[in-house]
Structures are given as structure tokens and as C-alpha cells.
Amino acid sequence: PGQAPGSEDAEFRKASFVTPRAIIKGSSARLPHLALNEHLTMEVARRSGMPAARTLVSEDGLALVVERFDTDAQGHPVLGVEDFCSLLALRPAEKYDTTWERIAQSLRSYVPAAQRAKQLETLLQIVVLNYVVRNADCHSKNVALIYGDAGDVRLAPVYDVVTTVAYTGFR
């Protein structure tokens, strides 16, 4: 992962609202059509066979609703989720300060041996997806492990994938 130019600027930030069942992301004037961009990019992931968070775009196109994959229909947590920023003991401001190799090494440490090869393959698919859709803003907070029943540790469905090349400063 590498930091996209301008991604930490205040003018690139957008409002987000978390509910028990969804994450609602607002738009930014500097990133036009971001909700539609993310929705379509997530559809590419889903249609390629990758587990991906489900998304919907508001009628006015200004908001994206991301269905949470860690809660049940009533909004109760059913899965533990931990992103690689946390797993690598990085502060949120350091989310770009790692490599895919370090993420893979961390994955090997947390995922049981029986699931490891499949999860490393999934990690490779995530890397390829972000390359193919030209997402220059993939970082360690956008890749996570989910914890289900005892011994069930796997990569979370992909989320927060955007074709950033559509925006000046993210090329």
C-alpha cells in the first residue's frame, strides 16, 4: 500500500455515519461521483467472485450505503473485525506505512494453518483487484481479518475499493 497524494488533506475528507447495520458515506466536492465510483468498483469485485461488502447508492448519487458484514439482521455483532493497521501495531496515521509483504506475514501469524493457503490466495486477489481497478488509496485499514467461531479466522470481504485514477492527485 502507498499513500495517494492529497489523501490526508481536509478538502478530500468526506462525512461518514455508522449504524448497527450500515456505514453511510457522504460525498466530497473534490471527489465527484465518489459514491457511484465505489459502488461500481465494489460490483467489479463481487462479480469477479470475491467476497465484497454490499453497497447501494442514494437516489441523488451523493451517498453510499455499505452493508456491514460483521453484524446480523438486527445489527448485533456476530464477527470480530481487526484491520491490518491494528494487527501491525500502527497508529491510524501510519496506515500507509507498511507493505503487502508485512501484511502477508501478519496474516500467516493470525490465520490457522489449515486456512492459511486459501487466505494468502485471497490476499493476492485483493492486491490484484486494487491494481486492476487502479485504487491508489488501498492501505492497511482497508484490509482486515474477521474472527468467527473458534479457529475461524479469515480475510474480511473487500471494502472501500475505489478507482482513484478518476481523481486528480490520486494517480
Predicted regions, residues:
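Short beta-alpha connecting loops at secondary-structure transitions
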Residues: 169-171
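Conserved ATP-binding subdomain of kinase catalytic cores across diverse folds
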Residues: 1-97
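Conserved kinase catalytic-core segment
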Residues: 30-46, 99-167
